[in-house]
Every structure is written in structure tokens, then in C-alpha cells.
């Protein structure tokens, strides 16, 4: 395993608009890329406002009140997902983002359709410790370790900065070239480079890229990100959007509906018979699902009502 050539190069940086066609080839070569201005600042600001009340009241991921506690994340981490339920910015601006969908199409073309495996806003409190170096999907989808080492990735993760990412407040560590390693037994923190970013920038990695969240050294700064994991439709998502009210689902574009699992999916194989079908018919046709409909008054927050956030 050769690592010397990858130790201290900087993460490549590309424009979300001007360099869109170069993004996925760059990830294939280096294992990571920083996409500048993936989300406009105005979208970041709206997304932050919409998630603020929910992040503040969400129990820690490892809370024993949860049916499926997440003991991988630190106790100084707050995480809220199923964002389509209450965030208009997520529903309209993130899910329909042209660069996001171009990159996902490029990454998964050999497999077929893709969707969101999880979209979660994570807030890391001051003094949040560094994570261990790891590869994504290993705490939920062990099948990825049984794939051929040179198989195309089945998922990618975009860590989108919603607040500044600095070395001091814990910007993500990445080992360039590690997506080509057979394992991560030789990985060390000394081999990492940092994903320093402004709000709206994103670091894109594959499910084989070795990385970790950094430690906050400021003692005062809270760091927030949108962790957006995209994957092939042949893999079960980590989150379910079945509780999102139908009027909200019908306000989405057909693309966004597919990304949150409310439309049938297709693979790339010849004579594809479809995925998530109902006796050979699609979900959307069976349900008579509409799209891009105006939302009724009072439906912006879906199942997350005012009482759920203490009347805020």
C-alpha cells in the first residue's frame, strides 16, 4: 500500500458551476474534492433558520429513549434528519441542486437510479472530540466490505458546511488516495489533510475514503454541517420519509420525490423490472401521486408541529 505520494497534498477545490463535469473524475483520482459554493449562502441561511429549533431539542444520537441509539457519534453531537418533513430549503433547493444530481448521476451510472440514504444536519458543540479514522457505511451496511475492491462506489457523502470549517474548530480530516487502499490498517492522523471551508462549500468523499471529524480546539465554537449521503437505490436508506405528510410529498418535484423514496426506482440492467414496485406498477401511478403542488396553509412543518418544538 503506497501512501507517501498522498500524505500532504491539499484537497482539490472545484467550482460547483464552472467545474461541474470535473468533480466526479477528480474524486475518482483523489478520493475527495471540495466543491466551492455548492449551496448559495442564501440557501444556507434559510436552512439554518429552519433547522434551528429542531436541532436544539433533539436528544443526543445515543439516547436510550431511541429505538435505534447511535453510539458512534459523540455525546456533544446533535443530529436531526428526515429534513424534508420541515425544511423548505432542503426540499426545494438541496434535493434539486443541479451539481448534486450531476455528480450522483456520474457516480452511480453503472448501477442505475440513486436516492438519499440520509440527509442529516449535525451540530458539534465546543470541545467536541475527534472521531476515529473510518470509512462510511461500516456501521450500517456491512455488504460494502464484501464488494470487489475495485467496484464502483455504492454511496458518496457530501459534508456541506453550514458554518465555517476551520482547523481550530474541527474541520474534517481526509486521507487523499485512501479510497484505493485495500484496508485502513495503516491509516494515521499524520497522513490527513483538512477540509477548511466556508458556509455553502462541501467536501465530497466516497464510501471508501478514510476520514474523520476533527477535534474542536477553540472551546467556544459550534460547528454545523449537512451530512448528505447519496447512494444507489439498491441499498436501503438509513432514514425513512414515510411519515412525511402526503401534501408535502406532492409539493416536491418528481426528482425530489424519487430521492426520498416516494417513487419507484430503476436499475441499469437490460430488461430492468424495476425496484419498489407494486405488482409491476410504479408507486407514483398506483397512488396517483401528484408533484409540484402548492402546499396547504400550515403544512410547511409537516409532522413536526409547533408543540414538538415547545411552541417556538
UniProtKB/Swiss-Prot annotation:
Q: Coiled-coil ranges per the record? A: none
Keywords recorded for this protein, A-Z: Dioxygenase, Iron, Metal-binding, Oxidoreductase
Record field: catalytic activity:
(-)-cyclopeptine + 2-oxoglutarate + O2 = (Z)-dehydrocyclopeptine + succinate + CO2 + H2O; (Z)-dehydrocyclopeptine + 2-oxoglutarate + O2 = (-)-cyclopenine + succinate + CO2; (-)-4'-methoxycyclopeptine + 2-oxoglutarate + O2 = (Z)-4'-methoxydehydrocyclopeptine + succinate + CO2 + H2O; (Z)-4'-methoxydehydrocyclopeptine + 2-oxoglutarate + O2 = (-)-4'-methoxycyclopenine + succinate + CO2
Amino-acid positions noted as binding Fe cation in the UniProt annotation, renumbered to this chain: 134, 136, 211
Note the subunit structure.
Answer: Homodimer.
Top-level taxon of the source organism:
Eukaryota
Q: What is its EC number?
A: 1.14.11.-
The protein depicted here goes by the name: Iron/alpha-ketoglutarate-dependent dioxygenase penM
InterPro entries attached to this UniProt entry: Phytyl_CoA_dOase-like
Gene symbol? penM
Q: Does the keyword Lyase apply?
A: no
Name the needed cofactors.
Fe cation
- Recorded family membership: Belongs to the PhyH family.
Single Gene Ontology MF annotation? metal ion binding
Enzyme type, top EC level: oxidoreductase
Q: What does this protein do?
A: Iron/alpha-ketoglutarate-dependent dioxygenase; part of the gene cluster that mediates the biosynthesis of penigequinolones, potent insecticidal alkaloids that contain a highly modified 10-carbon prenyl group. The first stage is catalyzed by the nonribosomal peptide synthetase penN that condenses anthranilic acid and O-methyl-L-tyrosine to produce 4'-methoxycyclopeptin.
